[in-house]
Amino acid sequence: MNIYVGNLNYRVREDDLKQVMEEYGTDESVKIIKDRETGKSKGFGFVEMPDDEAAKKAIAELNEAEYEGRQIVIKEARPK
C-alpha cells in the first residue's frame, strides 16, 4: 500500500521517516518530495509498504500524531 505522509517538519529526512515507519513493518521505499530548484523538502512524502495490514495500522496510529513538532497527516495515497 502506498501511504501519503503530510505536514512533515521541513528538517525531516527520508531516513527519519523510514525509522518511524519500520515500527509498523517493512517498507519498500520512502520518498520525501523536494523542490526541484532549491532541493528543500516540500513537507510531504510517500511510503510504500508491502503489508496492507501493517500499513493500515500505521495510518490508524500515526494520523494526526505529533512528529518533530508538527501534527502529521497520514493516509492511503490516491493514484495520480
Can you name each region flagged by the protein language model?
Residues 78-80:
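Conserved nucleotide-binding/hydrolysis micro-motifs of P-loop NTPases
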Residues 1-76:
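Canonical RRM/RBD RNA-binding surface and closely related RRM-like beta-sheet modules
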